[in-house]
């Protein structure tokens, strides 16, 4: 029975097997603005690594989600506001000026400055990765 379950694991839980083989970045989004984010999406739609995070009220933080630790999978965040949609292309906001994120956990905190999004990337060193 145990051998059968081990052989079936890649079929039953392909994401779990994939996550163990590749470095992972855990992300969440925080609304640090005074305006409601009516909808938030993050990721790369063409590779099915995009995540629908739903609405975020001011001060609210989304759930954690995991993506491969490759820039393309966490480079874009789209935020729907009451009258417009904004897209943030994340290329220069990483800790210590790095071009990509190291595997780990991060909060993407967004504020609005005029008609633009401002991102602060917060490494979450003391947290543990939540269950998927």
Where are these regions (language model features)?
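Extracellular Ig-like/FN3 beta-sandwich strand-entry sites
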Residues: 72-74
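N-terminal export leaders
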Residues: 1-10
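Intrinsically disordered, low-complexity segments enriched in small/polar residues
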Residues: 20-63, 67, 76-132
């Amino acid at each position: 029975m145990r051998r059968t379950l081990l052989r079936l694991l890649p079929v039953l839980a392909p994401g779990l097997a994939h996550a163990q083989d590749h470095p992972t970045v855990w992300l969440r989004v925080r609304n640090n603005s005074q305006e409601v984010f009516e909808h938030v999406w993050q990721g790369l739609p063409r590779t099915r690594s995009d995540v629908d995070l739903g609405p975020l009220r001011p001060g609210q933080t989304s759930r954690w989600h995991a993506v491969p630790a490759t820039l393309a999978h966490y480079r874009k965040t789209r935020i729907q506001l009451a009258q417009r949609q904004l897209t943030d292309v994340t290329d220069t906001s990483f800790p210590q000026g790095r071009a990509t994120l190291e595997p780990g956990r991060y909060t993407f905190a967004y504020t609005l400055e005029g008609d633009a999004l401002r991102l602060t990337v917060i490494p979450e060193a003391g947290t543990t990765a939540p269950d998927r």
